[in-house]
């Protein structure tokens, strides 16, 4: 994936080589300590409504990552033109396989809807249906598959036959269309490769 095909939105994008493969590196460059913000690399000239997004992603912690960093990495989709609305799904690798805290393990992945319905909004109200456990770790390639159909989103990890998370009613309007992005959050050095997009409409 060439960095020229991506637009920085509070991020810095570069091409790197991992295991002899050219990949896209994304780190935050703005809103550094703010959660669940519009911090992503946005695919230029993409217009996505319904379809399938598949990508492989790898997360590392930056040297200056705070203690609460979890390796946040994922996707944004249906991003509107001025980056003020989008849907998103991301994972927290440090809450995965190596985590021995049962509470943290319940927070392995997250759906959120920008700008209002962030993880903090859900946590404050005791809403847990947008999270689940994950069997993943830092510094390993994670395969993500997102199936988006009108108001429903279904997310799979590592080619699992069963979905990791099903969102029956996404929060923004089901007619919303927009760009696709690679989402990154606090303290994460994010890498992406092998993007495949299947458009249903």
Residue ranges and their predicted role:
Residues 1-201:
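Extracellular glycan-recognition regions
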């Amino acid at each position: 994936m060439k960095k020229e095909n991506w637009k920085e939105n509070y991020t810095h994008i570069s091409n790197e080589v991992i295991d002899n493969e050219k990949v896209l590196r994304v780190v935050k460059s703005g809103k550094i300590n703010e959660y669940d913000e519009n911090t992503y690399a946005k695919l230029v000239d993409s217009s996505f409504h319904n379809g399938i997004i598949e990508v492989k992603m790898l997360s590392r912690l930056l040297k200056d990552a705070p203690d609460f960093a979890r390796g946040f990495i994922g996707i944004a989709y249906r991003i509107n033109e001025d980056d003020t609305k989008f849907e998103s799904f991301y994972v927290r690798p440090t809450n995965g396989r190596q985590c021995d805290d049962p509470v943290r393990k319940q927070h392995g992945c997250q759906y959120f809807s920008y700008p209002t319905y962030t993880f903090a909004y859900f946590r404050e109200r005791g809403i847990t249906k947008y999270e689940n456990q994950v069997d993943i770790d830092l510094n390993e390639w994670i395969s993500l598959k997102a199936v988006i159909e009108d108001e429903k989103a279904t997310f799979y990890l590592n080619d699992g036959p069963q979905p990791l998370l099903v969102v029956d009613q996404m929060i923004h309007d089901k007619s919303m269309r927009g760009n696709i992005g690679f989402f990154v959050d606090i303290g994460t050095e994010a890498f992406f490769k092998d993007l495949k997009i299947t458009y249903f409409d």
